[in-house]
Amino acid sequence: TSVTGVQTCALPISKVYSVLGMLDAKNPLIQTRPFRSPHHTISATALAGGGQTLRPGEISMAHRGVLFLDELPEFHRDTLEVLRQPLEDGVVSISRVQGSVRYPSQFMLVCAMNPCKCGWYGDPSGRCKCKQSGIDKYLGKVSGPLLDRVDIIVEVPAVKFEALSRNDTDEPT
């Protein structure tokens, strides 16, 4: 019998959720890879983990799955910076007066962001009225060292609904 990737991940994923007391007694193993999408107002502690009980944070809850950060520049910069070491090492290290813990953090980071504060920069309609200094400030909220740890960056232009809903049979599938 072969073991699928999800089956080999079930125990490490379940261990993190066990520490949090989030396992179901009837189904003690999590059989799906996690997808975590914290709000941009999340604190650095909630993202990385810690607090009085040294709990795992969203980063470790995404272990062997996806951590999706929508509206990336809207996150506090200090919150984003806690991603750097876990992305590099695959582990979150937390040290407090109560002690030290290490939680696994091998996750795929997926981020989304607008090209400027209004979201229209580069759109052919010319709807963006942002000044270059505002665009630079907005994009500058994400540090270079964090972006260095992002393997693929893709610009996706807006596509009108009509273009998506057309029934073009001329295009190859």
Task: Describe each region flagged by the PLM.
Residues 1-9:
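Single conserved hydrophobic/aromatic residue that forms the stacking wall/gate
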Residues 70-72, 97-98, 111-116, 133-134, ...:
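A short beta-strand-to-loop transition that corresponds to the Sensor-1 phosphate-sensing loop
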Residues 38-43, 55-88, 120-124, 143-147, ...:
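Conserved AAA+/SF3 P-loop NTPase catalytic/coupling segment centered on the Walker-B
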Residues 130-144:
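Flexible active-site lid/hinge loop adjacent to a nucleotide/diphosphate
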Residues 81-101:
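Conserved catalytic/switch belt of AAA+ P-loop NTPases
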Residues 35-36, 55, 59-64, 94-114, ...:
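AAA+/SF3 P-loop NTPase mechanochemical coupling elements
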Residues 48-53, 90-95, 133-137:
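Short gly/ser/thr-rich secondary-structure transition/capping motifs
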Residues 10-60:
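P-loop NTPase nucleotide-binding/switch module
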